[in-house]
Amino acid sequence: MNAKDFLASKGITQEQLAQQLGCTRSNVSIWFSGKNAPSVDNVTRITDALNELGANVTYDEVFKVLWQSRQERKGA
């Protein structure tokens, strides 16, 4: 599952996640498109924010989606 589908499957938009994180939608887009990988701390923050929005996800799930996005972006 790609990052866009992951968020959609949870019923959460990038804008909602950005608001919960206190960052811009652009930051979220960069992370979820694989253009730039978030730090470990930010993956934790993303996981926490998603759960606060009702997504019921684990750190490992979020890390995997973000990692796959990064690998797809790099062409691996």
Predicted regions and their residues:
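A short, Lys/Arg-rich alpha-helix, primarily the initiator
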Residues: M1-Q16, Q20, N56-D60
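Short, basic-rich loop-to-helix N-cap that marks the start of a DNA-contacting helix
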Residues: K35-D48
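DNA-binding alpha-helical recognition surfaces that contact promoter or target DNA
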Residues: D5, Q19, I30, D48, ...
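Short, charged recognition helix plus adjacent turn
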Residues: I30, V40-D41, A55-A76
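A short, basic/aromatic helix-end/turn motif that makes direct DNA contacts
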Residues: L21-C23, L50-N51
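Alpha-solenoid HEAT/Armadillo repeat architecture
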Residues: A8, S33-N36, N51
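Recognition helix of helix-turn-helix/homeodomain-like DNA-binding domains
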Residues: C23-P38
